[in-house]
Amino acid sequence: MFYWILLALAIAAEITGTLSMKWASVSNGNTGFILMLVMITLSYIFLSFAVKKIALGVAYALWEGIGILFITLFSVLLFDEALSAMKIAGLVTLVFGIALIKSGTRKPVNAAKEATHAAV
């Protein structure tokens, strides 16, 4: 459970960092860029710890996919970006893809079970 919390923190940090990048580009000052740097760095640190117990493909798909989903939604709400039918179709496809990757991941087989199975 702890590693899933780390993954959630990585996703939240990535969303915040990416939105800060956009905010920095439309406002004056360096605060947005500093926040972006800190949050993206934290995102990678949290992700690197999360993949110790979560399959890399699953963790990365969730990290990137959920990030894209929320960044797109917040960009529409905060920065008045357009949300076309094509973008919506892409986001729906993304959600289904993440669900397929998550459901298709098996837990690693215990080394002792492998040795017993190989000996038989």
From Swiss-Prot:
Location relative to the cell: Cell inner membrane
Membrane-spanning residues: 1-21, 31-51, 54-74, 81-101
Membrane topology term: Multi-pass membrane protein
Keyword Ribosomal protein found: no
GO process terms (BP): glycine betaine transport
Top-level taxonomic group: Bacteria
Keyword annotations of the record: Cell inner membrane, Cell membrane, Membrane, Transmembrane, Transmembrane helix, Transport
InterPro entries linked: Small_drug/metabolite_transptr, Small_multidrug_res, Spermidine_export_MdtJ
Quaternary structure annotation from Swiss-Prot or TrEMBL: Forms a complex with MdtI.
Function: Catalyzes the excretion of spermidine.
HAMAP family (UniProt xref): MdtJ
Family recorded in the similarity comment: Belongs to the drug/metabolite transporter (DMT) superfamily. Small multidrug resistance (SMR) (TC 2.A.7.1) family. MdtJ subfamily.
Protein name (Swiss-Prot/TrEMBL): Spermidine export protein MdtJ
Gene, per the UniProt record: mdtJ
